[in-house]
Amino acid sequence: MAKTKKNIGKKILLGIFIAAVAIAVIATVVNFGVYKSLLKKGSEYNKVEIENQLVPEKDENDNWYFTTDGDLKVMHLTDIHIGGGWMSYGKDLKTLNAVATMVTREKPDLVVATGDIAYPVFFQAGTFNNYSGAKIFANLMETLGVYWTVTFGNHDAEAYSYFDREAVAKIYSDEDFKHAMNFVAYAAK
């Protein structure tokens, strides 16, 4: 009888383990689909047409600057909180739309996003993946065609997130992002 109880206990533990693995696999597949869908959505917006758009230049020390005798219009965004997971999908769509609408209407020369672009908080986003939120935001900004830069906030590289600051910095300093004005020390390592 003791052996039977032991076998039942092992079977229960095995069942729990298999269920946990199945849930993890399903969540991974669903979150990847959400990520691809949000990237696609971010690519569907129209490029912002800015009359007499200022074009930044770099000095001999690789510092960005604008030259103008007129106004420099800067838009400041913060706490964008793109979760990039199945639990935040609806909110993320609204966030992309809000950012695109503000940038399109205001037509800034530069957008400065000061932290918390990603929000990989599992119980709200359904993922710990902070890469997704960063990549989705960068993709949106490039689609809009405005110059942009970022700083990190506490949620962009949480201790429990999949990717560290260096990995996220590499996203923002990708050479394919022609409008990104990011000097990121982490990317040089």
Q: Across the structure, where does each feature detected by a protein language model lie?
A:
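Intrinsic low-complexity, intrinsically disordered segments enriched in polar/basic residues
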Residues: 3-6, 129, 160
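Hydrophobic alpha-helical membrane-insertion segments, chiefly the h-region
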Residues: 20-33
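N-terminal active-site segment of His-dependent metallophosphoesterases
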Residues: 31-131, 136
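N-terminal Sec-pathway targeting helices
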Residues: 2-22
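Extended active-site neighborhood of metal-dependent phosphoesterases/phosphodiesterases
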Residues: 41-50, 55-62, 132-189
